[in-house]
């Protein structure tokens, strides 16, 4: 008896995956739905945080827009490097056909932002007018944490949409299941139900194995957490600036822990739980820092504290009419 492709090594074989190419340019250049969905996730996240900066925090959204040109290449490179680190042997530059690990993209994006925003926000044109306790108009430099609170949670939008790209590619499926266990999926989302099948040939018969829609679970949890963070935590006045962005790392770690046990064996690797633990720890420590330690440090970012070591003169707030060099002041605003 001949047995072929019973257990998928990386992707499923079904009708959904067979149509993963959206269109072709010429005869050799294919554009995949994965890439289109990936770009849509980026654009939706950009639109969301730009509106947030403009209407909620009332600070210039230009720095966030210009950050796109740094974030996109850094995120893609970081995601690809991370994918290689966990064992993806595809061609490094084959971005259109999957092979992007979101953890690497997040790390690369956050590190680049930690360098970019403290530098660009020192430019006087991005400073904002505010009132001091006496009603005098002063100039303040927006905090990097404002942009972090606006931008970092929108990563969840990209992650939620990106999982649907994985679905069309036949990737990120859960453990083996049965048709009876997934009757709810067949009724609610017939196309997804069909997309979770893996067809194989046994002798002269075509059979299939069906898997849990892990991508759907992660996508759903990402949306729920985003709504909770962006439209719940953001409006709790007792929470300090930066808490919202740090909560992303905590909750994303929780999501990964909760879905890891349902992951198919070929998508698990030794460092998974270590990485998830680091996400949780970083989120908790970061939240504690911005909520309790940062106020003691007068809400000044670490880079500013280091710079101040070289300046003995104490910074003072000036009335707007007396202000000459707004870039020299390290004040922050958070509305």
UniProtKB/Swiss-Prot annotation:
UniProt KW Transmembrane helix keyword: yes
Membrane topology label: Multi-pass membrane protein
InterPro entries: Lgt
Locations listed in the record: Cell membrane
Record flagged with keyword Transmembrane: yes
GO cellular component terms, A-Z: plasma membrane
HAMAP family: Lgt
Protein name per UniProt: Phosphatidylglycerol--prolipoprotein diacylglyceryl transferase
Originating organism: Ureaplasma urealyticum serovar 10 (strain ATCC 33699 / Western)
């Amino acid at each position: 008896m001949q047995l072929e492709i019973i257990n998928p090594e990386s992707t499923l074989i079904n009708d959904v995956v067979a149509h993963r190419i959206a269109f072709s340019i010429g005869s050799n250049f294919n554009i995949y739905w994965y890439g289109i969905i990936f770009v849509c996730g980026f654009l939706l996240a950009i639109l969301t945080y730009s509106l947030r900066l403009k209407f909620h925090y009332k600070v210039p959204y230009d720095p966030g827009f210009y950050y796109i040109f740094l974030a996109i290449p850094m995120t893609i490179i970081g995601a690809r490097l991370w994918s290689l680190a966990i064992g993806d042997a595809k061609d490094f530059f084959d971005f259109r056909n999957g092979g992007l690990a979101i953890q690497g993209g997040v790390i690369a994006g956050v590190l680049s932002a930690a360098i970019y925003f403290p530098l660009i926000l020192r430019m006087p044109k991005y400073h904002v007018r505010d009132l001091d306790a006496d009603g005098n108009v002063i100039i303040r430099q927006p905090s990097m944490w404002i942009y972090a609170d606006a931008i970092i949670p929108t990563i969840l939008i990209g992650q939620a949409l990106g999982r649907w790209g994985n679905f069309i590619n036949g990737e990120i499926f859960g453990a083996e299941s049965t048709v009876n266990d997934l009757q709810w999926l067949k009724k609610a989302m017939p196309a997804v139900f069909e997309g979770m099948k893996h067809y194989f040939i046994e002798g002269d018969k075509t059979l299939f194995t069906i898997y849990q829609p892990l991508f759907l679970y992660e996508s759903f949890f990402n949306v729920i957490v985003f709504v909770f963070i962006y439209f719940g935590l953001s409006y709790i006045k007792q929470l300090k600036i930066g808490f919202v962005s740090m909560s992303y790392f905590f909750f994303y770690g929780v999501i990964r822990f909760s879905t890891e046990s349902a992951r198919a064996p070929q998508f698990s690797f030794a460092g998974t739980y270590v990485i998830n633990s680091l996400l949780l720890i970083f989120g908790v420590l970061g939240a504690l820092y911005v909520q309790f330690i940062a106020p003691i440090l007068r809400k000044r970012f670490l880079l500013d504290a280091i710079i101040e070591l070289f300046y003995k003169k104490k910074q003072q707030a000036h009335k707007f009419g007396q202000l000459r060099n707004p870039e020299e002041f390290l004040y922050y605003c958070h509305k």
